[in-house]
Amino acid sequence: MFWTLYAATHAAALLQPPAHVAIVGGGWSGWGAAKALIENGAKVTLLDAVPDPTGKTPFLTPTGKPFEAGTRGFWMDYPNIVSLVTSDLGLDENAVFTDYTNSSFYSPDGLEATAPVFSKGAKIFGQTIPELPSPLGQVVATVDLFERVPIADRVTMLGLLYGMLDFVRDETTFEAYDRMSAHQLFIKMGISKRMVDDFIKPTLLVGLFKPPEELSAAVAMELLYFYALAHQTAFDVRWIKSKSITELILAPLADKLASYKLPIPPAQGTAGEVVAVPEAEAALTVLGGSFVSGLQLDPGTGQVSGLTYTDRATGEKRSLEGLSGCVLALGAKGMKSVVQGSPALARRAPELCAAASLDAIDVISVRLWLDRTVPTRTPANVFSRFEELRGAGGTFFMLDQLQDDNPTLLWGNAEPQGSVVACDFYNAGALLALPDEELTRILMEDLLPVAVSAFGEAKLVDSYVQRFPGAVTWFSPGSYRKRPPLQTSVSNLVCAGDWVRMGEREHGAKGLCQERAYVSGLEASNALARNGHLGVGMGRQHIVIPIRDDEPQVVAGRAVNKALADAFTANPLVKALGLKASPWVR
């Protein structure tokens, strides 16, 4: 019976035309979805506004030098991306990523703090110490790494420990934390103003791209928990070792997926008849420079059946029809555009209208080519408390240190002259209107030489500036319920991206995180497969590797807190008085 059913299902799968799924948006989430869909036998059309979403065509400045928008790190707990690089693409991990590196925080007063590399053995007073349980290990390892913040202020960070154990006690509690700003929570938990201003605020500005007063307390706690509490080594970070992330990882992935062919159904003919075998069709079509303006729903089924887009090269409006499913791998800005152009979808999926109402964050990326090499303590660095930032978060990365195997690549294959510095401004709305020359002047005169004096001796050889208005998700207070779900109200429409709520498929990677974006793409494909939209026999689920288990003392702390809170709220007197287990949130 089993084999009969299997044979019938297999035959049906071969005879049916492959499902055709459109992916709107590239990046980690779009390519994650493409990978899982194509490996499941689907036909995929990926549309993105950038000219070449595959990464095969590197972006060059007008003077022929390489440029990448934003410098993004790869933290210790990125198991799915590491598996993609090593197992799926067969790349040498050490050729793709740098070693884990230290990071430095600089203010107008100079060096403020240095982040250790825990996996290399943290040091205290010059002596290497063994890995200690979290959070004890982090506290001990950073004793002598803060240059100016007094110990009395650092100790107040302990007030956050309870919040990190408490905020995920249940969905209701999480939403209560989400409605509160991180700034309010820090006050209620007794974190000193100096600790917030000198360390936590700059960290959030470059981690979630907004200051504490504009961030959801729940998402801030997620970030701090994921990177700082769950494991001592979770904060260890490394970087792309050459060229760009798109060239080293996404381009090989696109090449591999482009080699897939759709299955050819068995030839149908009468006995003795010679039947021509059709040529296998490529499983992947990539439409770069394509702006999707709307989705069409089938009036009968209420499912996505097509979309319209504009070809940037020609200005021509085109359509894609006969879709079996669709993945929206978009941020808030892209979601707003698609929903506004899709009246039927807006009526059917109010959750996407809510997502489209959320705001996003402005980003500016600057790359500087200098006439001499500038030595720094660490290759990755953060600006803190500089008035010239106008409320933005700022980072600078010494690419000549991170990508030192072939420095000529950083200079467009010309003879290297000195350091190449990648600088990013987040929450950069107050800087957007400044001309390029003023942004480079601020960096060369007001920021870099104050952080590292040797920059004062360097002269600018070349520079390039790009602005990205509304480019990044803003996790504002109360935004959780408005973030798009993995599965929408339209059964064959799913969402992917670091801001997506994955529900029962929730992953341990949190915040503005490449791992989370990639995993969400895999899970978006899995959702279409589970719901039968890829066809009979195409329900295969792409494996998603979970984050390693939290350290046992952290798990125990959460369990004890939940047990006590549940017992407290179950008390009849507590119920009668309307008391809360976490009275600082509501």
Predicted segments with their positions:
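Conserved flavin/dinucleotide-binding core of flavoenzymes
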Residues: 116-121, 310, 369-370, 375-586
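Mid-domain catalytic core of redox enzymes
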Residues: 40, 240-241, 251, 269, ...
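Glycine-rich FAD pyrophosphate-binding loop
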Residues: 38-61
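N-terminal Rossmann-like FAD-binding beta1-loop-alpha1 element of flavoenzymes
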Residues: 19-46
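N-terminal chloroplast transit peptides
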Residues: 1-14
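Mobile amphipathic helical/loop "lid" adjacent to a hydrophobic cofactor/ligand pocket
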Residues: 86, 93-218, 235, 530, ...
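Conserved FAD-binding subdomain of flavin-dependent enzymes
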Residues: 56, 64-97
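Active-site/ligand-binding neighborhood in enzyme catalytic cores
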Residues: 152-295, 302
